[in-house]
Curated annotation (Swiss-Prot):
Written domain comment of the UniProt record: The cysteine framework is XI (C-C-CC-CC-C-C).
Organism the protein comes from: Conus imperialis (Imperial cone)
GO terms, molecular function: toxin activity
Keywords: Amidation, Cleavage on pair of basic residues, Disulfide bond, Secreted, Signal, Toxin
Signal sequence residues: 1-26
Propeptide: 61-64
GO cellular component: extracellular region
Cellular localisation: Secreted
Name of the protein in question: Conotoxin Im11.1
Length: 64
C-alpha cells in the first residue's frame, strides 16, 4: 500500500512540474506588454507591446 501511495505521489509531482515548464515557456500574444522580441509569439516587440508589424514614427508612405 505504501508503494502505491508513493508512486501516485511521484506521478502527480511529475505532472505538476511539466505543467510549470509549459506555462513558463508560453509566448505573449499581440497587444500584450513585452520587453524583448523573443517574448512575443511572432517575435515582434514594438514600443513595449507585441505587434505583428512595427510602425516607425516619422516615416510617411509615398504614393506614386
Amino acid at each position: 500500500m505504501m508503494f502505491r501511495l508513493t508512486s501516485v505521489s511521484c506521478f502527480l509531482l511529475v505532472i505538476a512540474c511539466l505543467n510549470l515548464v509549459v506555462l513558463t515557456n508560453a509566448c505573449l500574444r499581440d497587444g500584450q506588454s513585452c520587453g524583448y522580441d523573443s517574448d512575443c509569439c511572432r517575435y515582434s516587440c514594438c514600443w513595449g507591446y507585441c505587434d505583428l508589424t512595427c510602425l516607425i514614427n516619422g516615416k510617411r508612405a509615398t504614393f506614386q
